[in-house]
């Protein structure tokens, strides 16, 4: 999806609203590149769980370069490079965990991050779904209660934004699209749901993800000698632009509403009790 004209300004204003409401200092924000080494990708286990969504970066084989240069060989659907050099990032938060593997944290912290992500979608593409997209996330790393509170606060922020933008929405418990839905990881995901999606007109535009101590154990990230818990609040920016365009049509109206949100008081810790989404940690099959 191309974001052009005034809708580009809408996206910038939307990001500014999110940054304001999550109240992070500038030093806690990072924009990641979209590349992972094949070793990092293997360490994540993504290709094991989601081989159908995996995207990799390949270069033309050196032996084929003269043929391409002379026009004797062309890039088409039948061309198969023999080596994969890098993998493409499927979710922004993975970079946060990879950067901290083997580390001991001194306190819980929240990281704001953004990156262009890639998934080889197996569903029809439209203005809400594409092979590449921009994912902005707010990731909590630390104590178990802090990770739960981050989800509640993220939900309260989403509630505030959608209410002020006058956008109808609902929360749905969601399961990641594992390739093998009978695998142990997929079965555990069903038994202990980790994700709520924010749904507008049948489209997921954001998600609340509670990983418990999965990434802390996997990457040996600790706090007080125990594996950390993690949670993240994720926003697909192109999906938000599509939603706002469908809802309003006129970017000027959206910019006015976002300017008011940029001055709104962020939800307090106590106000998260008003968040109406299902609490993941309390969900049972």
Where is each model-derived feature located?
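TRNA-recognition modules of translation machinery and tRNA-sensing kinases, especially anticodon-binding
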Residues: 1-282
């Amino acid at each position: 999806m191309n974001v052009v004209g005034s809708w580009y300004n809408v996206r910038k204003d939307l990001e500014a609203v999110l940054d304001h409401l999550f109240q992070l200092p500038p030093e806690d924000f990072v924009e990641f590149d979209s590349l992972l080494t094949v070793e990092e990708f293997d360490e994540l286990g993504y290709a094991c769980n989601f081989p159908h969504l995996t995207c990799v970066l390949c270069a033309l084989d050196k032996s084929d370069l003269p043929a391409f240069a002379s026009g004797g060989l062309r890039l088409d659907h039948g061309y198969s490079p023999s080596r994969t050099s890098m993998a493409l990032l499927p979710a922004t938060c993975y970079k946060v965990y990879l950067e901290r593997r083997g580390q001991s944290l001194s306190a819980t912290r929240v990281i704001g991050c953004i990156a262009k992500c890639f998934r080889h979608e197996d569903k029809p593409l439209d203005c809400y779904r594409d092979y590449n997209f921009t994912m902005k996330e707010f990731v909590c790393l630390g104590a178990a209660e802090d990770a739960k509170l981050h989800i509640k606060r993220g939900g309260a922020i989403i509630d505030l934004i959608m209410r002020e933008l006058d956008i109808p929405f609902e929360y749905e418990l969601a399961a990641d699209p594992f390739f093998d839905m009978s695998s142990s990881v997929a079965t555990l995901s069903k038994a202990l749901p980790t994700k709520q999606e924010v749904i507008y007109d049948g489209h997921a535009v954001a998600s609340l993800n509670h990983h418990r101590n999965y990434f802390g154990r996997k990457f040996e990230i600790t706090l007080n000698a125990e594996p950390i818990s993690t949670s993240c609040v994720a926003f697909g920016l192109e999906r938000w632009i599509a939603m706002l365009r469908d809802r309003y049509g006129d970017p000027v109206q959206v910019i006015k509403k976002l300017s008011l949100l940029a001055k709104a008081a962020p939800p307090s810790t106590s106000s998260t009790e008003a968040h109406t989404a299902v609490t993941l940690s309390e969900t049972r099959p």
